[in-house]
Amino acid sequence: MATPIKETRQDDVVTVELNGYIGENSPLFEVSLHRVEKLVIDMSKVNYINSVGIKNWILWSRNIPEDCKMELYQVPPSVVTQINQVAGFLPKQAVMMSIQVPYYCDTCSKEDTRVYELGKQYQLGKDGEDGTVTHPTDVKCGKEECTYTTDVLESKFFKFLKFHKPS
């Protein structure tokens, strides 16, 4: 089944909310970008992207006009991984405004994600410097005696902070 989307247009801004997975038949790839100056994509409900979805994303994103700003919100871990591993996945004009970071509780084995926002928990690099990430401390999992920790290898998950410099 194709990923359902909700598309809204207001003047020269297109907002797309994705739901499910990004695959071969995702209607995202059919969104018209004619006269669009800003493209906002909400990925909060995306659960994964398959290999054909990756290929189609790259082909589709090459057609985004260079002067069109692209903002990605709540990018899920599966997509962050692709951004870090696949050259050309994230267009130069794109900015990840927020990402979902996996967390794990060693005490009760509970898994969850936390949303990190650009300018709060992570910063993009400037003037040749690498970006930075600041993790919240003492993140409770819901039980008094339990505390979450990030469930990622920081050097791999936040690799995009080293190479992505939006135009």
Regions found by a protein language model. Name each.
Residues 1-15:
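Short beta-strand/loop segment at the start of cytosolic alpha/beta domains
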Residues 8-10, 42, 104-105:
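Acidic/polar residues at beta-strand termini and the immediately following turn/coil
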Residues 84-167:
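Cys/His-clustered metal-coordination modules, chiefly Zn-binding fingers
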Residues 6-9, 35, 62, 114, ...:
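Arginine residue identity/basic-tract feature
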